[in-house]
Curated annotation (Swiss-Prot):
Protein name: Conotoxin Vc6.6
Residues of the signal peptide: 1-22
Keyword DNA repair: no
Residue numbers covered by the propeptide annotation in the UniProt entry: 23-52
GO cellular component: extracellular region
Organism superkingdom: Eukaryota
Domain comment quoted from the record: The presence of a 'disulfide through disulfide knot' structurally defines this protein as a knottin.
């Protein structure tokens, strides 16, 4: 019985600790997340989910065009 209670308390403590440390240090992080999502709904072409990247072997100008992030005249 004592062991079960100790395990439950430990799990609750670790869960609370995870939530506290996982939150960004900005006090308005949720507001910024909401505004970004709202902007992406209004401007779907600007959404990061819609960005296209080139597969390996395709010609490129910079690494940010390639899915792998590596560009030496062609995507690697």
């Amino acid at each position: 019985m004592k062991l079960t209670c100790m395990v439950i308390v430990a799990v609750l403590f670790l869960t609370a600790n995870t939530f506290v440390t996982a939150v960004p240090h900005s006090s308005n992080a949720l507001e910024n997340l909401y505004l970004k999502a709202h902007h992406e709904m209004n401007n779907p072409k600007d959404s990061e989910l819609n960005k296209r990247c080139y597969d390996g072997g395709t010609g490129c100008d910079s690494g940010n065009q390639c899915c792998s992030g590596w560009c030496i005249f062609v995507c690697l």
